[in-house]
Amino acid sequence: MLLNIAVICLAACVGALMRWGFALWLNPGGLIPWGTLAVNLIGGYCIGIALAVFTSRPDIDPAWRLLVITGFLGTLTTFSSFSGEVVTMLMQQRFGLAFGTIALHLGGSLALTWAGMRSALWWLAR
């Protein structure tokens, strides 16, 4: 149990720092918070790969799933920042921008999760 906690904490630290780095790099001054979108899309693709690999390879130690999905990707991606940014847009009556942002995050994340799964399954079948 202690090893699982350590694995999650270590990976969560890396994911959170990467998310912060993307926000510092891409969010300032833009029409939409590009850093938040980037981490959610990258995370969507990566979780698709991870889910396909872990499902196809049940022999992989479960600690790896905790490290990759729960720790790293769980903190790299952010639903809370996305929600806060969209609600702020709505409160500013920037409705088109808010709904466009919702479409980009949800549609993009779902599409890239699917693409990540398909990519990994293709690679594993080779």
UniProtKB/Swiss-Prot annotation:
It is a multi-pass membrane protein. It is found in: Cell inner membrane. One of its GO terms (biological process) is cellular detoxification of fluoride. Na(+) is not transported, but it plays an essential structural role and its presence is essential for fluoride channel function. The chain crosses the membrane at residues 5-25, 34-54, 67-87, 95-115. GO terms for molecular function: fluoride channel activity; metal ion binding. Coiled coil: none annotated. Na(+) binds at G74, T77. Keywords: Cell inner membrane, Cell membrane, Ion channel, Ion transport, Membrane, Metal-binding, Sodium, Transmembrane, Transmembrane helix, Transport. GO terms for cellular component: plasma membrane. It catalyses: fluoride(in) = fluoride(out). Fluoride-specific ion channel. Important for reducing fluoride concentration in the cell, thus reducing its toxicity. Belongs to the fluoride channel Fluc/FEX (TC 1.A.43) family. This is Fluoride-specific ion channel FluC. It comes from Paracidovorax citrulli (strain AAC00-1) (Acidovorax citrulli). The gene is fluC.
